[in-house]
Amino acid sequence: MKIETQTEQLISETVTVYGLSPQIGVHALAQTVNALAAQGAVFSVCPDITEDEEQEADIRSEDMQDAHEPSAGISVQIAYPEYVFKSRIHKIEKLLKKACKKYNIMLAGVQASVNPAVRAIAVTVTGIAKAPKEEAWNRETARACKDIVFAGHAGMD
């Protein structure tokens, strides 16, 4: 979904991924970020840090939370069957928080609940980001090797 203003646009994407891996939340986050980036959102990556530095950074990040504006914001819903241990859900949440911190994404909240209708863990990530407003394409402003025009079935998507 896109909401346009005079200078920029607000884009939103929702992705659901199913599976039993602890990395499933990170996969859903990656798909959401890729979809947002494909629509023009820009993401910044924080440099890799060690675990000792990570603990110090957690303390400092509380003080410097307003120093960097987040690239995007996400909300996460996790539905899991009754037989899944809560420790697996906590692992998914921990990996998601770590990935969000690395890519400067604000994690608005994680909601996890037991759902007897699902057979595998279902992680739904809804992301929202700002992007520069797209200019209208026309023949007069088009330059060779600058614009990609999709035709046929690819252009219908």
Predicted regions located by residue number:
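N-terminal glycine-rich phosphate/pyrophosphate-binding loops that anchor nucleotide-derived ligands
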Residues: 1-42, 49-64, 105, 130-135, ...
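Glycine-rich anion-binding loops of enzyme active sites
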Residues: 42-59, 70-157
